[in-house]
Amino acid sequence: SIKNRTWLIDPSLIEEIIDMSDGYTVLPEVKGAGEEIATQFLVDLKYAIGDDPVYALPYGSPKIATRKKFSDVEFSQLQSVSSVRLARALGRAVTAGAPPNWIETPQKLSSMNISEFRTLRKELALISQVSSDLVISETAIRLNTLLNPALDKKSSQYLAVSFTGAVNRLAEKLRVLPGRYTLTSREEKVPVTIVNDFDAPAQVVLTL
């Protein structure tokens, strides 16, 4: 048997495998062939882990040094969320963050990925100021995948397009319908129509 073995696991990987094990389809409507393989993988993984210590990598395996540069507070929150989700996925206790004395492997990260992450992160932050809908925070968590240095160019481009579309759709969920108003004094009641397609309430401050 192997002793003193430590596991570092990205919760996004396990969640994707769990989704596969629940059944999936490949466009247009062909049933995926990996359902049984995914189910068996989860069984084998839990058996292999046994009582070994498990550490949760940040969701999406972003380059830690780069992610922390954006915000230490956000990174701490990401570590906490990642450990909770991995523990739920594996059905056992895990530790947030990397084990002691663990050193991140030096890997170059695409400047395009960093730029895309910076832009989309900023847009999500603005959207989150008016709505606390869970889909916003979920998108923000998944966005960290863009900072994964293991992504090849094709995967990076696909994710960038996918996340850009997702963030744009979120931005379109909250909008003010256009109208023409005549203001005759400093204080007026203006009939403004605001459309909120989020499930959660939104708080909007309009400045004229």
Regions found by a protein language model. Give the residues of each.
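N-terminal membrane-targeting/anchoring modules of bacterial envelope and secretion proteins
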Residues: S1-L208
